[in-house]
Amino acid sequence: MEGMLNELNFKFKSENPVDVVLPKHHYGVVGSGDLEVLLKKHELEGAVEIRVVSPVRGFDHVWEKVLEKVISDAEVGNVAIEINDNNATPVVVALRLAQALSEAKSAEQSVN
C-alpha cells in the first residue's frame, strides 16, 4: 500500500488536566521534516485525543511514548489534537507539540 498515509489515534489523560484557553489553534507547517499541530478545545472528561497522519509506518510505539510524555508534562485536558506529519523526528514532534500546547494554554494569546 505504498503512497497511503498512516493514521494513528491515541487518548491520554493527565493527573490534573488543565483546559486550553484558545478554542482553536494552529501551529507549524507541513514541510519536509516538520509537522503541523491543530488543536480544538473539546469536552473529553479531562482527556486528550490525538490523531496523527504520517507517511511513516512502523513507529506507532514511538509516537505513543513521545505524545504521552508531552501530554503528561503539559498537563492539558479536554482538547482534540490533529498532527499532520511530514517525516518529523521524535524530537521535532515533542518540540512542536509542546510549543503549540504552551501557546494554547496561555491567556495572553489573542484568538484569531
From Swiss-Prot:
Q: Name one Pfam family in it.
A: ACP
* InterPro entries cross-referenced by the UniProt entry: Mal_deCO2ase/Cit_lyase_ACP, Malonate_deCO2ase_dsu
TM ranges: none
Taxonomically, the superkingdom here is Bacteria
Task: Using the UniProt record, give the first listed, main subcellular location.
Answer: cytoplasm
Q: Where found, per UniProt? A: Cytoplasm
Q: Which UniProt keywords apply?
A: Cytoplasm, Phosphoprotein
Q: Which GO terms describe its cellular component?
A: cytoplasm
> Has the keyword Membrane been applied to this entry?
no
- Using the record's annotations, give every residue carrying the modification O-(phosphoribosyl dephospho-coenzyme A)serine: 32
Family to which the UniProt record says this protein belongs: Belongs to the MdcC family.
Q: What does this protein do?
A: Subunit of malonate decarboxylase, it is an acyl carrier protein to which acetyl and malonyl thioester residues are bound via a 2'-(5''-phosphoribosyl)-3'-dephospho-CoA prosthetic group and turn over during the catalytic mechanism.
What is this protein called in UniProt? Malonate decarboxylase acyl carrier protein
Q: What taxonomic classification does the UniProt entry list for its organism?
A: Bacteria, Pseudomonadati, Thermodesulfobacteriota, Desulfuromonadia, Desulfuromonadales
Q: Which gene encodes it?
A: mdcC
